[in-house]
């Protein structure tokens, strides 16, 4: 039995939705258009003992496609994919590498890569004056920590500015006129752009040391000068926030906080880090004379992955998601990404024929 072919009655007497529109059609939706120019120089000197490159790019994306809120009615669903505006991105990348030391028995090779990117929303069209994102989950209603609007820098947090605590341990914030107000009196208009989760500099640095038949490889990586929103401290660092466990710091360095949590720059931290991603030690055995040229050589190696992280960030991992305009937080509610990276140990053999 059905009603308008969209609902079916189940054996228990309940009506179940069978089929219908799940998205609003937009017949005016067009392709995103990308325009980009690059200026680059590649170089190799001293018989390729020193090499590298430098690239600078500027990219404009028009007809940005994004899912925006629409009224019901006339629309059947509350969102629709639309072309909403344009974005500008620019950046550079520099690479240098080569043999630092080269002797008969010993070679030290190194490769250094530096990059920087920045972007902004150039225009928003139609009724899309702004778009909020990076919403925080319950308990409570913390709100959103990002806003996309004309002229906004990609990676900025759109949050309240912390002004201190009152005598009862409640948050004090700055309003739009820089007056200090109790957090309970705040409005959305008092939010401002604070900090940025886009690293000012991304660094990759690899080293390879070879001594006769031994080889040692070390890979390092660093993000420099960027902000991370420590949601763990915000949710679990305050006493009396619900029926769940809290951090030890809730009764230590955060014991003075008694009021409701607030999305403000009190929880922004510098996420700068240096990671040793991997260390590999190997030994190569010549095998031609032992296998009648069947095997040229065998390399035995061991690798330690995720060796260590050096950072001043107090959370679990400063390397948060920085892809998109509403990231930069340790989202503990995203279980697929929240678990810490484990250290790995690998033993292997490589056969060359």
Where are each of the predicted segments found?
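Extracellular/periplasmic, surface-exposed regions of secreted and cell-surface proteins
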Residues: 4-145, 212, 268-353
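Membrane-proximal, glycine/serine-rich, low-complexity loop/turn segments characteristic
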Residues: 4-9, 127-130, 153, 161-162, ...
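Flexible glycine-rich, low-complexity coil/linker segments exposed to the extracellular/periplasmic environment
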Residues: 4-24, 137-194, 243-267, 331
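Short clusters of hydrophobic/aromatic residues that line enzyme substrate/ligand-binding pockets
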Residues: 29, 64-65, 84, 121, ...
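C-terminal extracellular loops and terminal segments
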Residues: 81-86, 130-157, 194-204, 208, ...
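Exposed, low-structure sequence patches enriched in small/polar residues
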Residues: 113, 126, 156-165, 171-177, ...
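C-terminal beta-barrel architecture of Gram-negative outer-membrane proteins
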Residues: 215-276, 316
